[in-house]
């Protein structure tokens, strides 16, 4: 139990030694609890140790397990852990009881706070890195007009949706204090609605990615007939009435705490969570069909368009499970085990905060069209500056006497 619990143990021993009546009563209660147990042969009799734990009648040679005491010298302990004591082969209890697993609840709360603060740091770090990467990707798609086809416009809008979601995440973290959270003012509810709207747009733009690839590869429908406004309606338009319906539900049935969380028995959050799960499942079906076609019909094809489709599919195959895993984690109960809870907190914090970074990497930084356009821009910039440098050097060379005399001779001849 550590140094301080050991000091408390010494004090408890002194107190118990001075009060034999209470010890005798505990022994009687422990003996009465052991009457129901059927133990034959050599055995250890029921006994209460100096901490107050009842060790029931047990066969010789057995290691007996008992829950940690709920209270010990005014301190609460975690009763889900156990203490251990051996019933020796001669039918007597071992003098030493192993309480090493028993931990103060105060210490557990401190550990939980430490893990919480680390998770907060991971969240801030991940969202900062993601936001920087997303902004760089956004500027690249904005500046590189030569690659502005419908496929890359969809990538660009997906990145924009993630930028807005990350930005509203920072707004929520920096403005919604516990006091504001409890007061449930109108502006904090609007901030929550905006964050949830951009959260939904992430999934619908991923759905747009899946629709485009499924149309081009599985349905073999010409992508020239697809229009940007169709995907704008899917990505930005459809989530809006969903969030409006959710906000109305919150206003009438769960209007508290800035619309974060939910009360037991109130399911208004499923108004926007349901469509997110639906488009996620549809995208998984799309990807299954796309991969099936790529593995059969397009394997031998080496056209540049097919290569781009394959790379887009690879990116979507990585990102869609990434988005899906992080969202499905909200429905998972990590359990009571401390290790599983800590792993769950860290894993969820990492995936949730670094999503934007992964989207930027797979759809922009690893995009061969983007990289090729950047290389061309870089070469043009180098050529332009090298020409300027050569001209500047030529202009800075002083005119030699030979050239001056020759020029004057030509002028005199012309006259």
UniProtKB/Swiss-Prot annotation:
Signal peptide: 1-23
InterPro entries cross-referenced by the UniProt entry: GPCR_2 (IPR050332), GPCR_2-like_7TM (IPR017981), GPCR_2_CRF1_rcpt (IPR003052), GPCR_2_CRF_rcpt (IPR003051), GPCR_2_extracell_dom_sf (IPR036445), GPCR_2_extracellular_dom (IPR001879), GPCR_2_secretin-like (IPR000832), GPCR_2_secretin-like_CS (IPR017983)
GO annotation, cellular component aspect: endosome; glutamatergic synapse; plasma membrane; postsynaptic density membrane
Record SUPFAM superfamilies: Family A G protein-coupled receptor-like, Hormone receptor domain
Membrane topology: Multi-pass membrane protein
One Pfam family per UniProt: 7tm_2
Topological domains annotated Cytoplasmic: 143-149, 219-225, 296-306, 369-415
Gene3D superfamilies recorded: GPCR, family 2, extracellular hormone receptor domain, Rhodopsin 7-helix transmembrane proteins
Region Important for peptide agonist binding, residue ranges: 99-108
Record PTM: C-terminal Ser or Thr residues may be phosphorylated. Phosphorylation at Ser-301 by PKA prevents maximal coupling to Gq-protein, and thereby negatively regulates downstream signaling.
Main localization (coarse): membrane
This protein's record includes keyword Protease: no
Transmembrane segments: 112-142, 150-174, 190-218, 226-253, 270-295, 307-331, 339-368
Keywords noted in UniProt: Cell membrane, Disulfide bond, Endosome, G-protein coupled receptor, Glycoprotein, Membrane, Phosphoprotein, Receptor, Signal, Transducer, Transmembrane, Transmembrane helix
Glycosylation sites: 38, 45, 78, 90, 98
Tissue expression summary: Detected in brain cortex (at protein level).
Disulfide bonds: 30-54, 44-87, 68-102, 188-258
Phenotypic effect of disruption: Heterozygous mice are fertile and produce homozygous pups at the expected Mendelian rate, but about 15% of the homozygous males die between 3 and 12 weeks after birth. Mice are deficient in CRF-mediated secretion of ACTH and show no increase in intracellular cAMP levels in response to CRF. Mice display a marked decrease in the size of the zona fasciculata of the adrenal gland, where corticosterone is produced, and have very low plasma corticosterone levels. Mutant mice display reduced anxiety.
Family, similarity comment: Belongs to the G-protein coupled receptor 2 family.
Record text on subunit structure and interactions: Heterodimer; heterodimerizes with GPER1. Interacts (via N-terminal extracellular domain) with CRH and UCN. Interacts with DLG1; this inhibits endocytosis of CRHR1 after agonist binding.
Function according to Swiss-Prot or TrEMBL: G-protein coupled receptor for CRH (corticotropin-releasing factor) and UCN (urocortin). Has high affinity for CRH and UCN. Ligand binding causes a conformation change that triggers signaling via guanine nucleotide-binding proteins (G proteins) and down-stream effectors, such as adenylate cyclase. Promotes the activation of adenylate cyclase, leading to increased intracellular cAMP levels. Inhibits the activity of the calcium channel CACNA1H. Required for normal embryonic development of the adrenal gland and for normal hormonal responses to stress.
Protein name (database record): Corticotropin-releasing factor receptor 1
Organism expressing this protein natively: Mus musculus (Mouse)
